[in-house]
């Protein structure tokens, strides 16, 4: 069985009853507006339309609730202890006992009462020892005191709401959404009201007296709600005043009287004896301790310490936490005593203790009243007139325009405002002559850090004061008639800020005509080290002589050409390498001499260049013509391509035998892995390390 679904059904039934009450009250309001109000054209009035709309919505919602309740009831199937559904067999029999028709259907729960009856009638819930339900009187006699106390705790005065009162009364709380419809465990019936339920017994479900007593005998709980479903254990114990506690105790006494009167007026059995069910209820009501409601005036700590066996023990504090709490308590006591001494002034300690003991009222143990101490007032600094210092502070803030105008008038009267300071303003609100108002600070150390330097005057340590220094700034410069000269920079930095927040600073230089003759030609030259300057001077001297340097250069170049020719004859080179060797020989050949006039024609060589180093130019004489020079430049213009081809050919020579490994473009078969993937390429460092062990792929 699913208890939560049953609880949901019961809760929806109670909401159904509340909504029906609200709809009735709205209907009465509509009738009053139409009949008793006597307003002409009241049917078209806005408030009547509003009430009609609410009435219609409530009716629709109530119908939906009723249909959902019936649907949920029909879905609840009775199951046995093994989880199998209990089947109902309906047969129609004639007078002779012949079966006319039969139908088998799973047994469903029609209401909460049927659920309780069916659940008790299942075979798994009978007493196995005697083979059936035992007698109630013998069961009650065998109950121990602990079991009776447990049953009273489980009941918690649910008897009035579950139907032990006369049938025309029920306990409900105020119709607030989200609040439980049942009174609290500790007898908080002050807000409860009695009314006649407008719903018939078929729509609203409630337990009868016999079902409740039967559940008490069997030791089961009368409340359908689970533990902690709607309210917590100590919910009613928190934040209660003495007046609420007394009203709760009186409400409990009234409920007890009504229950006992109902039990005394009940009917007798067939044997003439009073029913044992009423005796059980009377014993439970009389044995329930009423002092609990009265003793709730104590603090929550006292209630927690005087708990029953079922409540948890308080956690054991560590030594560190105990010491911390003790220091806090002692600190609070010291603060209280010191503040009292300050506030009481000239009184002695003995009088302080007397006034403190007299001001605190000890709680009466008989009435268990909570005495609320008045908050302690700490001493506050006061003025000579006895007014609080914090309240007597007057702020100089300007609260209105009138205060500002009054302040400006006072400053004009005292001469603080100068007539010259009121200058014209531009479109941005800035004063045009603001630079004239700038004055130098009188303190010479205004912009410097103050050091702790000390001087010893007459053996005494005295710090230097600013007033001891003479004022450096003259009064003529301080006057507004002779302002300081301002030096403007040669460039203007204009900062443009876009909407995205990026700032672009544009540096606008001054016109260059004024600065053309300021810098000499030496300032634009590159910085050359002293070693290169010395070397260039030596080379210039050798070129002028033209004896020793040319001879050495020709010898070296001849040696290089001979070595290159010998290597080309010994090794067979590709045609590409032959082209490369010819280019190198042409590059390394000694330049032919030519007159200096032709060089000046197409190179525009200035006279200043002679004093500076030009790399790889041993002399300023060029031996070739202009056309030959241009052709050579075109041939060797793409030196990067030549060097790249050189290193490609160099990579191929990885074996001493002179055999070449073809590139991927030249190779028809690409070596593959076992899985069919291309093998990774080896770097040139790996190939150089492996050398002869590199496999050569043949195809």
UniProtKB/Swiss-Prot annotation:
Disulphides: none
Swiss-Prot/TrEMBL keywords: Cytoplasm
A GO term from the CC aspect: cytosol
GO biological process: formation of translation preinitiation complex; RNA polymerase I assembly; RNA polymerase II core complex assembly; RNA polymerase III assembly
Region (Disordered): 175-208, 289-364, 539-603
Subcellular location: Cytoplasm
Predominant subcellular localization, coarse grouping: cytoplasm
Compositional bias of kind Polar residues: 195-208, 339-360, 548-573
Biased composition (Basic and acidic residues): 183-194, 323-338, 574-603
Segments of skewed composition (Basic residues): 308-322
InterPro entries: DUF3835
Name of the protein: Uncharacterized protein C736.07c
Organism phylogeny: Eukaryota, Fungi, Dikarya, Ascomycota, Taphrinomycotina
